[in-house]
Amino acid sequence: MRMIAMTATKTMWASHLIRFGRLAKLIAIAVAAIALLAPRYSVCADSAPNVVLNTGKAGPRSVESPTERVILRDYKFAWANLEQAMESSSTAPLSGLFVGTANAWLTDAVASQRRNGLSSRYLNQNHKVDAVFYAPEGDMIELEDTADYDLQILDGDKTVHNEHVVVHYVVLMTPAADRWVIRQLQAVPQF
C-alpha cells in the first residue's frame, strides 16, 4: 500500500513539474514577445499626435462630454495608426479605424508606396479640430482638421523629401460597435 501511495505521490509531482515547465515556457515566450514588440510601440507612444478638439460650433445637436472624449481618443488613435501604416507601407496597423472611402484611399496610398519602394513619416503632428456638424440622431459628426506636421518621404533608409506642411481635412466619423471610425478624410484647400 505504501508503494502505491509513493508512486501516486511521484506521479503527482511529475505532473506538477510538467505543468510548471509548460507554464515557464509560456511565460518565457510572452516576455520575449513583449521585449520584441515594446520598442515598436514605445516609438509610437513617444510621437503620439497632438489633437485639440473643439465641439463648441457643432450643431444642430451639442456633443455630449463622453462622446467628445471617445471621438478625441479614436481620432488620435486613427492618426497614430495612419502614421504607422504609411511608415511601414502596410495596412496592418489600421485596426479598422478607417472605413468606406477613407479606407479605400488609405489602402491605395499604402499599396502605391509599397510598389514604388517608398515609405512616409508624419512627424510632430498637431491637429486643431473643430466639430462643425453633429447629426440630431448622434450617428455622424463632421470635423474640420487643420493639421500641421513634418512630412518625410523615404526610399529605403534615405530621406528623399522633407517638408513642413499645413493641410486642411474634412472628416466624417460615425459610431461603430465600440469606437468611432473615419469614413471620409479629404484634404481641401481651405474651410
Give the location of each predicted region.
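Polar/charged side chains located within well-ordered beta-strands of beta-rich proteins
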Residues: 75, 124-127, 145, 150-151
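Exposed beta-sheet edge and beta->alpha loop/turn motif
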Residues: 3-22, 34-45, 136-191
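Short, low-complexity N-terminal intrinsically disordered segments enriched in polar/charged residues
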Residues: 44-100
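A mature extracytoplasmic/lumenal domain signature
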Residues: 69, 98-101, 109-110, 145-149, ...
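Bacterial N-terminal signal peptides
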Residues: 27-35
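Short solvent-exposed beta->alpha transition segments
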Residues: 65, 91-136
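Contiguous, function-dense segments enriched for cysteine-driven chemistry
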Residues: 48-49, 55, 59, 63, ...
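Short solvent-exposed loop/turn micro-motifs enriched in small/polar/acidic residues
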Residues: 77, 125, 164-166
